[in-house]
């Protein structure tokens, strides 16, 4: 790959407090070499070609926080490879997947499978959630500590809400004790 130069872009990077018009230089290995208003036609070697973005945006990768993926169980609809190709084409570099799969993501063996498949097949970062309750039934809590130790980033029952207030209270206490993220649909 040859070095690439981009100019006249709206660059937005909240992490680095950048919100300006400028350019971007990407080296031969795909690594960003320079970014910002100092990158313009004045500092691009005359023999090099550049891409004028004419005000289009350059941003860090987008994270989709609520993705229902078909894997496992509904691969005929979508799998990690097709999901990641579609999202990557739109600038999404990371997704948080919901536990509404078949089987439901509610135990460590499914989490192991999911993380392995995501690592092997996806071209983007996959961050799985597990269900709050076993089999998404709203009656028995999943093992937050074990699931979190396996790499689950949060817990949700997807589109379902917990109707049992005692159970929800137990869930919130456990989440607090373990510093777990709870994503509840309302």
What residue spans do the PLM features occupy?
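Divalent metal-coordination and catalytic microenvironments
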Residues: 9, 24, 30, 55, ...
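N-terminal metal-binding scaffold of metallo-dependent hydrolase/deaminase domains
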Residues: 1-44
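A short helix->loop->beta-strand "cap" motif at the edges of active sites that frequently abuts
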Residues: 48, 92, 179-180
């Amino acid at each position: 790959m040859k070095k690439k130069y981009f100019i006249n872009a709206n660059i937005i990077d909240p992490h680095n407090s950048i919100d300006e018009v400028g350019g971007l230089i990407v080296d031969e290995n795909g690594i960003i070499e320079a970014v910002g208003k100092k990158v313009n036609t004045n500092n691009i070697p005359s023999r090099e070609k550049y891409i004028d973005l004419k005000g289009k945006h350059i941003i860090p990768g987008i994270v989709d926080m609520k993705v229902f993926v078909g894997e496992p169980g509904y691969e005929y609809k979508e799998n990690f490879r097709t999901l990641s190709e579609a999202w990557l084409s739109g600038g999404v570099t990371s997704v948080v997947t919901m536990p509404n799969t078949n089987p439901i993501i509610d135990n460590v063996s499914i989490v192991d499978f999911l993380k392995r498949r995501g690592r092997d097949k996806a071209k983007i970062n996959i961050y799985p959630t597990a269900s709050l309750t076993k089999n998404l039934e709203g009656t028995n809590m999943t093992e937050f500590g074990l699931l979190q130790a396996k790499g689950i980033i949060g817990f949700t029952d997807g589109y379902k809400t917990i109707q049992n207030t005692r159970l929800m209270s137990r869930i919130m206490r456990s989440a607090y004790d373990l510093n777990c993220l709870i994503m509840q649909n309302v």
